[in-house]
């Protein structure tokens, strides 16, 4: 009974992981598509996402995360067993952490640019761009918000891969040679 329950739990965990590996793929593609098409022209001139270095970084980061999502999804689907080896668990943990930080920096960069675009900064002569380029700002905001949703997915993946990796280790030995079992409440 315990083995069937454990196997069912592992299968459910794998399905949950697959969901969080496919979701950021769709979100990254959506964020990239919105930003790549983002441009607006008016009497003040033309504005394109590529005119803003931080938005280019956002597109690149979403592209890298989308590629990683495809590869990690394929790796998860094509894996022969439910359990990961030590090496694979470490690799997934490190890559999940790295991509989480990558998309975090891209999202924060986008948020900062949007704050400057909406609020301006008179000390550095940055005017409120969104007053004149409303459509551009709305599309950029949508892309940044979707990128932040990608961040949440990658945070969950980081937690899952950390749990998968560190649950492979024994509990530490404490006083008098007794093991501490943290799995019981």
Swiss-Prot record:
Residues 1-15, 79-90, 163-185 are cytoplasmic. It comes from the Eukaryota. The keyword Transmembrane helix applies. Keywords: Cell membrane, Membrane, Transmembrane, Transmembrane helix. InterPro entries: CASP/CASPL, CASP_dom. Disulfide bonds: none annotated. One of its GO terms (cellular component) is plasma membrane. It is a multi-pass membrane protein. The chain crosses the membrane at residues 16-36, 58-78, 91-111, 142-162. Homodimer and heterodimers. Belongs to the Casparian strip membrane proteins (CASP) family. This is CASP-like protein 2A1. It comes from Picea sitchensis.
């Amino acid at each position: 009974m315990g083995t069937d329950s454990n196997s069912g739990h592992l299968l459910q965990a794998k399905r949950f992981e697959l969901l969080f590996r496919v979701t950021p793929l769709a979100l990254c593609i959506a964020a990239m598509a919105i930003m790549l098409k983002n441009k607006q022209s008016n009497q003040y001139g033309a504005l394109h996402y590529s005119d803003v270095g931080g938005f280019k970084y956002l597109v690149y980061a979403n592209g890298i995360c989308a590629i990683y999502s495809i590869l990690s999804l394929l790796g998860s689907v094509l894996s022969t067993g439910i359990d990961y080896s030590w090496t694979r668990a470490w690799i997934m943990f490190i890559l999940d952490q790295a991509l989480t930080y990558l998309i975090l920096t891209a999202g924060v960069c986008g948020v900062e640019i949007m704050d400057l675009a909406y609020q301006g900064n008179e000390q550095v002569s940055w005017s409120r761009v969104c007053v004149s380029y409303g459509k551009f700002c709305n599309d950029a905001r949508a892309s940044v918000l979707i990128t932040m949703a990608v961040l949440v997915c990658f945070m969950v993946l980081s937690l899952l891969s950390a749990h998968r990796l560190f649950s492979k280790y024994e509990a530490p030995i404490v006083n008098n040679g007794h093991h501490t079992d943290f799995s019981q409440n």
